[in-house]
A protein has these predicted regions:
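His/Asp/Glu-enriched, well-ordered alpha-helical/loop segment
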Residues: 1-4, 8, 14, 18, ...
């Protein structure tokens, strides 16, 4: 059985978010990329496009399946930094306070499901 997915589904058009569940497409991302990208993302892609950036909560709410990974060797291979990023949307120093685009944070069980 084929399981179609979009790899690096990091910055999506919000209109496309519900299409993942409707079409049975897995949204594959690396949570640590969100915290690596956050310092420059708005300047490079614009505030409007950030509405669909690392949209884990929106994708989950629509019924889409998420697949998480580390993208090693681009990021560290250990899963704990990715779990931390998915739950807090903060970097290793705890920045920004409250998390980047915090409405997209996941619970620990949801983040763990993405990695397993």
């Amino acid at each position: 059985t084929l399981r179609p997915r979009v790899e690096h589904a990091q910055i999506l058009d919000p209109a496309d978010l519900p299409r993942f569940a409707a079409l049975g497409v897995i949204a594959s991302m690396q949570p640590t990329h969100a915290t690596s990208d956050m310092p420059w993302a708005q300047a490079r892609v614009g505030a409007d496009r950030l509405r669909g950036a690392y949209a884990w909560r929106q994708l989950t709410a629509s019924g889409a399946a998420l697949a998480f990974g580390s993208d090693f060797p681009v990021e560290r291979v250990e899963p704990l930094p990715g779990l931390y990023a998915a739950v807090t949307r903060q970097d290793a120093q705890g920045e920004p306070e409250g998390g980047w685009l915090p409405k997209e944070r996941l619970g620990l069980a949801e983040a763990l499901a993405g990695f397993t």
